[in-house]
């Protein structure tokens, strides 16, 4: 289910404060966050946000097409190494 329009999008307060502070300075630096559930807002466009994937921080450069999506969508948590080869096929 989608979030109620009355409530608005979820963005972690600490993340929003960091983005607004960098926008006020006009500075571009990597913002490290663990908040994968935060929604990408138009204020974040042009920033690089390092999103935690459970093991490391994955740098995500925010573009206009990402607005409205969650940060966690762009930092995959699982690494797929391929299916195992069938042992009978080798004979």
Curated annotation (Swiss-Prot):
Detail the disulphide connectivity of this chain as listed in its UniProt entry: none
State the taxonomy lineage: Bacteria, Bacillati, Cyanobacteriota, Cyanophyceae, Synechococcales
Keywords of the record, alphabetical order, are: Ribonucleoprotein, Ribosomal protein, RNA-binding, rRNA-binding
Q: Which organism is it from?
A: Synechococcus elongatus (strain ATCC 33912 / PCC 7942 / FACHB-805) (Anacystis nidulans R2)
Please describe what this protein does: Protein S19 forms a complex with S13 that binds strongly to the 16S ribosomal RNA.
Database matches in SUPFAM superfamilies: Ribosomal protein S19
Protein name as annotated: Small ribosomal subunit protein uS19
What does the sequence similarity comment in the record state about its family?
A: Belongs to the universal ribosomal protein uS19 family.
One Gene Ontology term from the biological process aspect of the record = translation
UniProt xrefs under Pfam families: Ribosomal_S19
User: Which GO-annotated molecular functions does the record name?
Assistant: rRNA binding; structural constituent of ribosome
């Amino acid at each position: 289910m989608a979030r109620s329009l009355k409530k608005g999008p979820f963005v972690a307060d600490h993340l929003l404060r960091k983005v607004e502070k960098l926008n006020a300075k006009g500075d571009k630096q990597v913002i490290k966050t663990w908040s994968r559930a935060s929604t990408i807002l138009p204020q974040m466009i042009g920033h690089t946000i390092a999103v935690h994937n459970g093991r490391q921080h994955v740098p995500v450069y925010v573009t206009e097409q990402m607005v409205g999506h969650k940060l966690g969508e762009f930092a995959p948590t699982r690494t797929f190494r391929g299916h195992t080869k069938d042992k009978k096929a080798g004979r």
